[in-house]
Swiss-Prot record:
Positions of the UniProt region annotated as Disordered: 1-21
Database matches in Pfam families: F-box, Kelch_FKB95
Gene3D superfamilies in the record: Kelch-type beta propeller
Kelch repeats: 119-165, 167-215
Family matches, as SMART domains: Kelch (SM00612)
Lineage: superkingdom: Eukaryota
Keywords: Kelch repeat, Repeat
Organism whose genome encodes this protein: Arabidopsis thaliana (Mouse-ear cress)
The protein's name: F-box/kelch-repeat protein At5g03020
Listed InterPro entries: F-box/kelch-repeat_ARATH (IPR050354), F-box_dom (IPR001810), Kelch-typ_b-propeller (IPR015915), Kelch_1 (IPR006652)
Domain F-box: 14-62
Length: 347
């Protein structure tokens, strides 16, 4: 036996995506959670092109892979602009920053945020202490920010809702409504990329009913339990609820004894139906009164997902599905309302 024959043959090189047929490679990538797309887009220019391609979305739709993702906007100490994060699914359960950041401009104060499929709309708000008519949009399919045409009127924290794919916006003025009724409300049509006025007196019943049931509070969540709309909110660090109608008494959510030591600060809708997420902070590593100057402190943001069960007319019981630290800040962060907005994107 010769020396060459005695040597073992080297193992074959691993199969790469580039060696697969295009349709097979496309099908494989379509089955990967969108949460990993930002990382995949860093692999190569070819990956970035494919992730933004309509063919990938068409394949995902064909194989039935829509996903709900909870997105939160955090206000952090010493950061002039809030930062948007996407909440990773089980098992990681971590906040992952959205890249790129908000475009090079001041993030508005008190905007209204709504979602439509894979897109997040940042509507109005204060920019340099003045009401703004700007509308920015972030698309999770392409991971890009872009600016929409300006609204007809500057608005701060207006009522807004997505109806039949169009963005309806009402109010948000200083004091009472403007004397010009045509400017009190407007609607954005993505197909024409234009804003058009709407008359409040001419809104159909569907639009009116949607706005009556709409809630615009970052510290509250609204969901349907046993076919009844319920409003949940945080008060004094605890979770409370009431039916979403006038005259119904507010009551504490039972079953959360294991979380009694945690002071909840925010409640948000979860990506799944019939559940909410509650958020709170903890500070460690010798956090003293002057830690804001020394920064010898660590702040942790925690989240728990709670499923809810209605028991009779007067009791709502919560069940903790999981509870976990989701984000760490290497300093003290005393901002109380650290979640300024949240939405759920579906795509």
């Amino acid at each position: 036996m010769t020396e060459e024959m005695s040597k073992e043959s080297p193992p074959p090189p691993p199969t790469s995506f580039s060696s697969l047929p295009d349709d097979v490679a496309l099908d494989c990538r379509a089955r990967i959670s969108r949460f990993h797309y930002p990382t995949l887009s860093l692999v190569s220019k070819g990956f970035r092109t494919l992730i933004a391609s309509p063919e990938l979305e068409a394949t995902r739709s064909f194989i039935g892979k829509p996903e709900n993702h909870l997105c939160v906007c955090l206000r952090l100490y010493k950061n002039p602009n809030p930062l948007w994060f996407i909440f990773s699914p089980i098992p990681k359960q971590k906040l992952k920053p959205i890249v790129p950041w908000f475009p090079n401009q001041q993030y508005p104060q008190y905007p209204t945020v709504v979602s439509n499929g894979s897109q997040i709309y940042i509507i109005g708000g204060f920019v340099r202490r003045r009401r703004s008519n700007r509308v920015s949009i972030f698309d999770y399919r392409t991971y890009q920010w872009r600016r929409l045409p300006k609204m007809r009127q500057p608005r701060v924290y207006p009522a807004a809702s997505v109806i039949d794919g169009k963005i309806y916006v009402i109010g948000g003025f200083r004091g009472s409504m403007p004397t010009d009724i045509e400017n009190s409300g407007e609607v954005y049509d993505p197909k024409t990329n234009t804003w058009e006025p709407i008359l409040l007196t001419s809104l159909d019943l569907t639009v009116q009913n949607v706005f009556k049931k709409k809630h615009y509070f970052t510290t509250k969540a609204c969901l349907v339990i046993n076919k009844v709309s319920c409003l949940l909110y945080v008060s004094d660090g605890k979770l409370y609820w009431r039916e979403d109608k006038e005259g119904f008494e507010c009551r504490k959510v039972y079953g959360l004894a294991e979380q009694s030591s945690n002071l909840f600060r925010v409640v948000a809708n979860s990506g799944g139906g019939g559940r909410v997420t509650v958020w709170w902070k903890s500070m460690t590593k010798g956090c003293e009164f002057d830690c804001l100057l020394t920064e010898e402190c660590e702040t942790k943001i925690w989240c728990a997902e709670i499923s809810l069960e209605r028991r009779g007319l007067r009791e709502l019981r919560g069940f903790v599905e999981w509870s976990k630290e989701v984000f760490t800040i290497d300093r003290c962060d005393y901002i109380y309302d650290f979640i300024s907005q949240y939405v759920t994107v579906t795509y």
